[in-house]
């Protein structure tokens, strides 16, 4: 089933979260852990699978509480984007490598 297009009319449940918004969400989740003095592995890199796992679990457990508010949409419930977030949390390459992989896959057959 193709993703729904975002109408930006409030409670958005379509695939309109950008990667940078998701990265900002990850940073805010880590900042929340720091604020509550849960500082174990908060400096871990996403590719450090063992150390970052605790942060991933925190993000997964709290997806229902996260909301992204921007000028595009008044409230985008993050839990509705759980598949995309799970995919991003599962990437085991740096983003530059992942970008090159996706671009080469998409543009393998040039049509122009």
Swiss-Prot record:
Signal peptide: none annotated. Residues 42-61 are annotated as: Dimer 1 domain. It is found in: Host nucleus. Keywords: DNA replication, Host nucleus, Transcription, Transcription regulation, Viral DNA replication. Residues 72-101 are annotated as: Dimer 2 domain. InterPro entries: Baculo_LEF-11 (IPR009429). Belongs to the baculoviridae LEF-11 family. This is Late expression factor 11.
């Amino acid at each position: 089933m193709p993703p729904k297009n975002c109408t930006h009319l409030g409670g958005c449940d379509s695939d309109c979260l950008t990667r940078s918004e998701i990265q900002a969400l990850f940073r805010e989740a880590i900042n929340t852990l720091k604020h509550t003095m849960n500082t174990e592995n908060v400096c871990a890199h996403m590719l450090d699978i063992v150390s970052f796992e605790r942060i991933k679990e925190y993000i997964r457990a709290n997806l229902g509480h996260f909301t992204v508010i921007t000028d595009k949409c008044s409230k985008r419930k993050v839990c509705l984007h759980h598949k995309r977030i799970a995919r991003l949390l599962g990437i085991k390459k740096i983003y530059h490598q992942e970008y090159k992989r996706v671009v080469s896959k998409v543009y393998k057959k040039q049509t122009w």
